[in-house]
Structures are given as structure tokens and as C-alpha cells.
Amino acid sequence: MEKRTNKMGIDNQKTSFEHQSLEVSMLDKDNFSDEELDSYLSKGEIKATDKVTIPPKILFVGDCTIATFGNFSASTGKAKSKKTFNISAMVAAAVTNTTVLNYRACLPEGKRKILYFDTEQSKYHCHTVLERIYKLSGLSFKKDDPRLMFWGLREYTPKLRIALIDYALRKYDEVGLVIIDGLRDLMYDINNGKEATDVMTVLMAWTSVYDLHIHTVLHLNKNDNNPRGHIQYSVNSYVID
């Protein structure tokens, strides 16, 4: 794909919704034309004559399915509770389509690429996570494996992080699994109900439009076992224990 320059506004962290998907651009709109409404309605229509297949099951813990295409899941835990280590094992299993620790993966051909977005760690710590995944996968450190792409989005605003994830999903083909480590960092205010709903909406849109699975990480408060902010009420049913 030809590289687009100055479209994402990296320097000043402004985004141009002209170049975003409908799924993301709709979040900042209050009014829709009849043409737009007709397009959305047509995309959402369910017909008896539709040929609908069962979504592939791609991740397991033992005999329990924890991930299918068209859905998303979440992990929670306090700081230093090995959340990222568990995610590393999950990704390592997905990269190799084998069993790593407690996780077993079975991604279909043509959907083997994994995109990993970390929203809060430094480049050094992101690289440490990537090294751990390679080690668990048995991959060589001498070359980058094309099945796994990793980005650190710590320095960007929540709106730009969403735009970058959306751009990556449009840019790269054959994606089957997306990791977002730091879901709260896609929001400006974790206690804002509208923002929480918007983030959930875009997650559901991405999984549906691109037919993949998204696994997110939510962080617990230090003094209790509750995920931080209003977003907790939206994702509780998606949490993997």
C-alpha cells in the first residue's frame, strides 16, 4: 500500500475523519444523511436467505473456547498480576497455532496475522513483551516474523490511538487476532458513559467488519477487584477469568 503522508496528523495528533472507516467516523457525528442511513441499514439487514456460517473458534483454554471471530474478550488484573505474561502466552500460541502454557490456538489459513497494540508501556518494555512472545513461540530473534506486528501507542492521544488501530485494520490483510493492551487509554475520561459506549461500539464494529477477534486488557483498581471507571460495566460479560 502506498504510504500516506500527513493524513494521520502525527505531529499535532489531529485526525482527519475523511480517511477513517465509517465505523470510527460515525462516533463524532450527530446527524446522518439519508444515503448514510440507507447504507448502515443495508449493512445491518438480516435475511432468511442469508448463508451464515458458524464463527471459527480460535483460542481455547483446555476444552473451553475463549475466542471466536466476530467477538471480543477482555482480561483484568491489578498491576504486576501477570496480565501481560498471560497475553504473551496467548499470542505465542496464536502465532504458532499450537499450545503454549494453558492456551491452544487454531487460526484458519488466511487469518493468521496478529496485531498487538500497547497503549501505556515504554518502547523498552514493549520490546521486552515482544521478546517474551518470541521466546514462548520458539521464534528466531534474528528476523521479524511477519505473522506478528507490534506497536507502542503510549505517546498519542486516545482519539489518535483509535484512528491508528482503525488504519492498521484497513491496511493489513489476513488479520485474525488483535490485542489492545490498555483499553482505558482509548478514552479521555474513564467515568464518561458516552465514551465507554463509543469504545464498545467501535470494538464490536471492528470485529464484525473485519471478521476477527479482539482481546483487550483492563486494569483493576489497586485497592479492590473492580476494573477502573465506567468502562467496567460495559465489558464485564466479556472478561476471561
Where are the language model's segments positioned?
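Phosphate-binding/switch region of NTP-binding enzymes
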Residues: 74-76, 80, 84-85, 194-241
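The Walker A/P-loop phosphate-binding site
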Residues: 24-133, 140
